[in-house]
UniProtKB/Swiss-Prot annotation:
This is 4-hydroxyphenylacetate degradation bifunctional isomerase/decarboxylase. It comes from Salmonella dublin. One of its GO terms (molecular function) is metal ion binding. Its EC number is 5.3.3.10, 4.1.1.68. Its cofactor is Mg(2+).
Length: 429
């Protein structure tokens, strides 16, 4: 699997029924109006026959579903035209720990090593009326039909491509029911559906696997960008949030990356698009269960990113929605990677943002809530960080709106200067 794996939460009617009462109360206050997207990063993806790793002391749930595989580049496509952009479908297992909330990114539940088995692709005549069967150790444990999904495969492709360009090889997991099948070490989980190659994976205790296997994740040219929400206390206060007690980590899709001296599009009819100057840590070698004391040994260097956000699209659940943070070209990054040896103290760097030459934002990495070693240790405790992966460490206070015609310049002392222009939708087309 070479592309990005997108997944959607709350797309099965049984989930909405189960959460209906909760969604009428704080912090949600209303059910979701749009699809609730998240990303399964590359460390999660395994093939037929490879082991699902069972973390000690956790409850692990199987999530049988179907993956739509994108066949050609799709941007802003109507659902009626979606079939032209679909190469085929594959069975998938959206493995997860139990979720007690949809209010924050569920990276610890969703993004562990091996938590996204994907089967072989095949054409399918009717994905919207497909019975999906889960067998555990040769016996049926569950079945459900895609007719009960809230949004069809075509509707999901259309909704996602409205703000994110989909590329050949990308996958969209169509959703899972509320009730999932519990797994145990030693189980063999097999997923079946008429017309698609079966997907079968053993479940192996994580510590046993580590003792008996030498395992190297396949590397790709593009690493995963993990981003931090509210990692500066002054920024949390600026947005009227309490500083988090645990890192709020979300994932940026590759479609959102753009380079130095490139443009970012402000959508028409929005009221608030703001910049976010961030120090980015680049991982230099594979990291798994790394202590804080040794974490900096795994850093290759640093760069700068601008994590633009469209606040109009932020709904009050499962933050942040991809429509806010993963739109095409919304994350300028660069202009280069500075070797870690050239930065004597990454926790004492000044960040500044200028809009049309006017200083709008200024802060220091000394005010990070969660330090770089802590973040590397935290993430590597439950997932494998790979060379080329990146961690955007958050932004300080000082946000303001930007409009077409603005030049936005980010500076981090000792790391780099990143320049970007804002354009309207018409100029981008």
């Amino acid at each position: 699997m070479k592309g990005t794996v997108f997944a959607v939460a709350l797309n099965h009617r049984s989930q909405l029924d189960a959460w209906q009462e909760a969604f009428s109360q704080p912090p949600y206050n209303a059910p979701p109006k749009t699809a609730v997207w998240f990303i399964k990063p590359r460390n999660t993806v395994i093939r037929h026959g490879e082991p699902i790793l069972y973390p000690q002391g956790e409850k692990v749930l199987s999530g049988a579903t179907v993956a739509l595989i994108v066949g050609k580049t799709a941007s802003r496509k109507r659902s009626e035209a979606a079939a032209e952009y679909i190469a085929g479908y594959a069975l998938a297992n959206e493995v997860s720990l139990p979720e007690e909330s949809f209010y924050r990114p569920a990276i610890k539940a969703k993004c562990r090593d091996g938590f996204c088995p994907l089967g072989e692709m095949a054409p399918l005549s009717d994905v919207d009326n497909l019975t999906i069967i889960t067998e555990i150790n040769g016996r049926e444990a569950d079945h459900w039909n895609t007719a009960d999904l809230q949004r069809s495969a075509a509707q999901l492709l259309s909704a996602l491509s409205e703000f994110a360009t989909l590329n050949p090889g990308d996958a969209i997991l169509l959703g899972t029911p509320q009730n999932r099948v519990a797994l145990r070490p030693g189980d063999r989980v097999r997923i079946l559906a008429k017309g698609l190659p079966a997907l079968e994976n053993p479940v192996v205790a994580e510590d046993e696997f580590a003792r008996n296997q030498t395992f190297t994740w396949p590397l790709s040219a593009t690493g995963t960008l993990f981003a931090l929400g509210l990692n500066y206390a002054d920024h949390a206060s600026e947005l009227a949030f309490t500083p988090p007690k645990e890192p709020l980590v979300f994932i940026k899709a590759p479609n959102t990356f753009t380079e130095h001296h490139q443009t970012s599009v402000r959508p028409n009819n929005v009221e608030y698009m703001h910049y976010e100057a961030e120090l980015v840590v680049v991982i230099g070698k594979t990291a798994r269960k790394v202590s804080e004391a040794e974490a900096m040994e795994y850093v290759a260097g640093y760069t700068v990113c601008n994590d633009y956000a469209i606040r109009d699209y932020l709904e009050n659940y499962y933050r942040p929605n991809l429509r806010v943070k993963s739109r095409d070209g919304l994350t300028p990054i660069g202009p280069w990677i500075v070797d870690k040896e050239a930065v004597s103290d990454p926790h004492n760097l000044t960040l500044r943002t200028f809009v049309n030459g006017e200083l709008r934002q200024e802060g220091t990495t000394a005010d990070l809530i969660f330090s770089i070693p802590f973040l590397i240790s935290y993430l590597s405790e439950f997932m494998t960080l790979q060379p080329g992966d990146m961690i955007a460490t958050g932004t300080p206070k000082g946000l303001s709106d930007v409009v077409p015609g603005d030049e936005v310049v980010l500076e981090i002392k000792g790391v780099g200067r990143l320049v970007n222009q804002i354009v309207c939708e018409e100029s981008a087309n």
